Design a protein with these regions (language model features):
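Active-site-adjacent elements of ketosynthase-type condensing enzymes
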Residues: 22-24, 82-92, 132-153, 179-199, ...
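Condensing-enzyme catalytic core mediating Claisen C-C bond formation in acyl metabolism
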Residues: 1-47, 149-218, 222, 226
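Beta-strand segments within the central parallel beta-sheet cores of soluble alpha/beta enzyme folds
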Residues: 5, 33, 70-78, 105-108, ...
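Conserved catalytic cysteine-centered active-site region
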Residues: 32-36, 40-52, 79-133, 260-288
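Conserved beta-ketoacyl condensing-enzyme motif
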Residues: 5-7, 47-108, 115, 231, ...
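Conserved beta-strand-centric core segments of catalytic alpha/beta enzyme folds
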Residues: 1-20, 118-184, 288-321
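Conserved small-residue
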Residues: 5-7, 33, 61, 75, ...
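A contiguous, well-structured pocket-lining segment that forms one wall/lid of small-molecule binding clefts
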Residues: 203-273
Length: 321
């Protein structure tokens, strides 16, 4: 059985926070942030929740795919910032949209999460027995930030994106490449919650996201081009035949470096990090929905989706739109 993406949706919080806004609460400036990252603004959840944004993105994706919640057989949500430790985000969305026939579970692969979830859903559908999958990437990273650390908090935003995968007679998912390197995981991490156990003393304080930016950059510019190249080759294509490269929106410099190493023009690399920042697992599906809504994709186009981030993890998928 073949699999195609048949619908997309996304949701961003109402509050738009510019670099100048951040300059009012910390030692930073628009010039400092923009020159290093390409980010101009990001959206921060105030009243919104990971679950609420995921539900809205899911509803939009189902509408775009022209199916009902009852048609969904499986829901996979990728997140590192669910509202609850349990039940999982996918189960919360299942309840909210009324997908009573679906099996639902979460995946945590940080910024690569949506790619891992997408590929997992595709394998379920290819195996048979399932017709439609709802895949979600969603984050409220603002609650995980140290808002006194300008090297990290200025990079991230909140939001949710979703895609519907459907069993098809046409080629849709052409190839999938994934990888992990736990040996270098400390370059981007966030420690677990404090231990609450009367039999074990804990000296851990609350933890926030910490990152070695230079190491993450080196990892990304080396690993992503190889993953993309491998995925394109597995699909039986050449890089020149790819119409669009939708990369995780971490940093404009990283995207430029990947473009250069692949020998492909930046015109093939649409971005939204200028207005969204880095939204981890939500980054790729939100960009996919933006590109879809702006009419940039036509039937038969070959598109690469690629994610990379904490773990370290990475993934690349080639799709036939």
């Amino acid at each position: 059985m073949k699999v195609k993406i048949t619908g997309t949706g996304s949701c961003l919080p109402k509050l738009r926070v510019t670099n100048d806004d951040l300059g009012q609460i910390m030692e930073t400036s628009d010039e400092w942030i923009r020159s290093r990252t390409g980010i101009i603004a990001r959206h921060i959840a105030v009243e919104e929740t990971t679950t609420g944004m995921s539900t809205e993105a899911a509803d939009k994706a189902l509408k775009n795919a022209e199916i009902s919640a009852e048609d969904v057989d499986i829901i996979i949500a990728a997140t590192v910032s669910a509202d609850k430790h349990l039940p999982g985000l996918a189960c919360e969305v299942q309840k909210n949209i009324g997908a009573e026939n679906a099996v639902a579970f979460d995946i945590n692969a940080a910024c690569s999460g949506f790619l891992f979830a997408l590929d997992t859903a595709a394998l379920y559908l290819e195996h048979g027995g399932y017709q439609h999958a709802l895949v979600i990437g969603a984050e409220t990273l603002s609650k995980m930030m140290d808002w006194t650390d300008r090297s990290t908090c200025v990079l991230f935003g909140d939001g949710a994106g979703a895609a519907v995968l459907s069993a098809s007679k046409e080629d849709g998912i052409l190839s999938m490449v994934q990888g992990s390197d736990g040996f270098r995981g400390d370059v981007l991490n966030c420690m677990a919650r404090k231990v609450n156990n009367p039999y074990k003393k804990s000296d851990k304080a609350l933890s926030y996201v910490s990152m070695n930016g230079q190491e993450v950059y080196r990892f990304a510019v080396k690993t992503v081009p190889k993953a993309v190249t491998d995925a394109v080759e597995q699909a039986g294509l050449h890089l020149e035949e790819i119409d669009l490269f939708l990369l995780h929106q971490a940093n404009y410099r990283i995207i430029e470096a990947v473009s250069k190493r692949l020998g492909q023009p930046m015109e093939k690399f649409p971005t939204n990090l200028e207005e969204c920042g880095n939204i981890s697992a939500a980054s790729v599906p939100i960009l996919l929905d933006n590109v879809n809504n702006h009419g940039m994709m036509r039937k038969g186009m070959k598109i690469v989706l690629a994610g990379f981030g904490a773990g370290l993890t990475w993934g690349a998928t080639v799709i036939n739109w």
